[in-house]
From Swiss-Prot:
Pfam families: DELLA (PF12041), GRAS (PF03514)
Region feature PFYRE, mapped onto this chain: 405-496
Family classification: Belongs to the GRAS family. DELLA subfamily.
The protein, known as: DELLA protein GAI1
Region (SAW): 499-575
Region (Disordered): 1-28, 153-182
Function (record text): Probable transcriptional regulator that acts as a repressor of the gibberellin (GA) signaling pathway. Probably acts by participating in large multiprotein complexes that repress transcription of GA-inducible genes. Upon GA application, it is degraded by the proteasome, allowing the GA signaling pathway.
Disulfides per UniProt: none
PTM entry text: Phosphorylated.
Length: 590
């Protein structure tokens, strides 16, 4: 068939196999009229366009079949076709939905200008274009992409050079298909021209390419938010949702949570105050079951505490992160097997008040007391309710002479950074407790900087890696609920980092280097975690499904757990600066 392009001032020619042009009269009445049968059904289709409509129907059928085979079948349910009676354009828009782009509306004032395409010289092999990525295989490992790469030219005058392409087109997959009606015409699918010869290429969704555009749009939206360009940010956050649906696995989930955080910040629909602590504890339990991060945190902290308690007859653990008490059965069993018999074990569990008037901390202590009786460990427990760790004072904890004290905190101290002077008060109270060991586990990330865009970029990389590790855990269908609830657990953190400010932003994670500086200035010295902890942590990961992707790393006496090359959590141990050094095993080495 032939496709005619009509210009109001110049005669138009249609591309033909012989390359000859055909002159057309400017009078539209001389063109073929509307097809009467389709007109009765409400569709305005010229008889001369029937072949083109048939071709688009064939293309749409082939794209749907191929997309279903790839597991990528989708249509944007929110798309509005303003004139569905225009059957040709309607089919074209449906085809474009299978390959969504941020610039789907070419006249969108919020997006950068698109370089004009040369349809006269186009070929099935698009020319190579520069990419800001340093590797063609992304594996969804996000790179630092400045938001300016997308819309830095939006405010520029029209005479400025067009913005560079947002993604490489050389990765687009083409599947040749034959058709009896496929003549030598130019088909425009997915926004760029492809000449059809005897075989007509059909553009399929390229998840990697769309993923690149998705990252660009996320970064651009975050920069628009920082610049308080809310009109642009609103347009971009809608595009994020449109692009995310074409992604599979971790990328789609991460983008969805970040889009929610951005939307809440744009529309000022801030998340409700932190959920009931018991529900948050349940989410963390699912996270504990799904992946090894909390297991690693508990194991490495327990190992440091066990070594500090060596030879002590009366020991006292003060736990800033009691939750469900999952950390302590393993330590109690290790103490029960200690040569010479177990010590007298006292545990003070600190937690927030419950909103349902239940004594949650008492229930946890009762279960631990039952275990202690079973393994013949003398056990004493006290649950201590506190609205904030910053409200603690050493005198409240009934410290006793002759006790060896250990203070433990897992994912708790970073929230104190939202309260001015909070972390300083807690560290001062810890010093007054005169502990033999302080164990701290925190996220290895910097989500507490003053610049929103920097926090957004860092958190996007961090949580993308975390979600990738969840996908790589090899979770069985039986544990699907654990995985889903773990994603909710991480999604709440994302929303807090992105949407909230001031005291409501409590997910203020900092790096190990930052914690080292803070604890050093507060009067604490680091205690090396020995090679025994390193080896046993590595063995723990070897037993965990999907453990091939996890890596234990020693960092100046501290232990880190990460996914592939990215550290995600860090365990460190500390003692008072004026205390003699604790005996330690050989420093870890990997």
């Amino acid at each position: 068939m032939k496709r005619e392009y009509h210009h109001p001032h110049h005669p138009t020619c249609s591309t033909s196999p012989t390359g000859k042009g055909k002159m057309w009269d400017a009078d539209p009445q001389q063109d073929a009229g509307m097809d009467e049968l389709l007109a009765v059904l409400g569709y305005n289709v010229k008889a001369s366009d029937m072949a083109e409509v048939a071709q688009k129907l064939e293309q749409l059928e082939e794209v749907i079949v191929n997309a279903q085979e790839d597991g990528l079948s989708h249509l944007a349910s929110e798309t509005v076709h303003y004139n569905p009676s225009d059957l040709s354009n309607w089919l074209g828009s449906m085809l474009s939905e299978f390959n969504p782009t941020p610039n789907c509306a070419l006249d969108n004032p919020f997006l950068p200008p698109i370089s004009p395409l040369d349809y006269t010289n186009c070929s099935t092999q698009p020319k190579q274009e520069p990419s800001i990525f340093d590797s063609p295989s992304l594996d969804y490992d996000l790179k630092a992409i400045p938001g300016k790469a997308l819309y830095s030219h939006i405010e520029q005058p029209p005479q400025q050079p067009p913005a560079p392409p947002l993604y490489q087109r050389d990765n687009k997959r083409l599947k040749p298909t034959t058709s009896a009606t496929a003549n030598s015409v130019s088909s425009v699918i997915g926004g760029w021209g492809v000449p059809t010869e005897s075989a007509r290429p059909v553009v399929l969704v390229d998840s990697q390419e769309t993923g690149i555009r998705l990252v660009h749009t996320l970064m651009a939206c975050a920069e628009a938010v920082q610049q308080e360009n809310l009109k642009l940010a609103e347009a971009l956050v809608k595009q994020i949702g449109f692009l995310a649906v074409s992604q599979a696995g971790a990328m789609r989930k991460v983008a969805t949570y970040f889009a929610e955080g951005l939307a809440r910040r744009i529309y000022r629909l801030y998340p409700d105050k932190p959920l009931d602590s018991s529900f948050s504890d349940i989410l963390q339990m699912h996270f504990y079951e799904t992946c090894p991060y909390l297991k690693f945190a508990h194991f490495t902290a327990n190992q440091a505490i066990l070594e500090a308690f060596e030879g002590k007859k009366r020991v006292h653990v003060i736990d800033f992160s009691m939750k469900q008490g999952m950390q302590w059965p393993a330590l109690m069993q290790a103490l029960a097997l200690r040569p010479g018999g177990p010590p007298s074990f006292r545990l003070t569990g600190i937690g927030p008040p419950s909103t349902d008037n239940t004594d949650h901390l008492h229930e946890v202590g009762w279960k631990l007391a039952q275990l202690a009786e079973t393994i013949h460990v003398e056990f004493e427990y006290r649950g201590f309710v506190a609205n904030s760790l910053a409200d603690l004072d050493a005198s409240m904890l009934e410290l006793r002479d002759g006790e060896s004290v250990a203070v433990n905190s897992v994912f708790e101290l970073h929230s104190l950074l939202a309260r001015p002077g909070g972390i300083e008060r807690v560290l001062s109270a810890v010093k007054d407790m005169k502990p033999d060991i302080v164990t701290i586990v925190e996220q290895e990330a910097n989500h507490n900087g003053p610049v929103f865009l920097d926090r957004f970029t860092e958190s996007l990389h961090y949580y993308s890696t975390l979600f990738d590790s969840l996908e790589g855990c090899g979770v069985s269908p039986v544990n699907t609920q654990d995985k889903l609830m773990s994603e909710v657990y991480l999604g709440q953190q994302i929303c807090n980092v992105v949407a909230c400010e001031g005291p409501e932003r409590v997910e203020r994670h900092e790096t190990l280097a930052q914690w080292r500086a803070r604890l050093g200035s507060a009067g604490f010295d680091p205690v090396n975690l020995g090679s025994n902890a390193f080896k046993q942590a590595s063995m723990l990961l070897a037993l965990f499904a999907g453990g091939d992707g996890y890596r234990v790393e020693e960092n100046n006496g501290c232990l880190m757990l990460g996914w592939h090359t990215r550290p995600l959590i860090a365990t460190s141990a500390w003692q008072l600066a004026n205390k003699p050094a604790l005996p330690s095993s050989t420093p870890a080495s990997n």
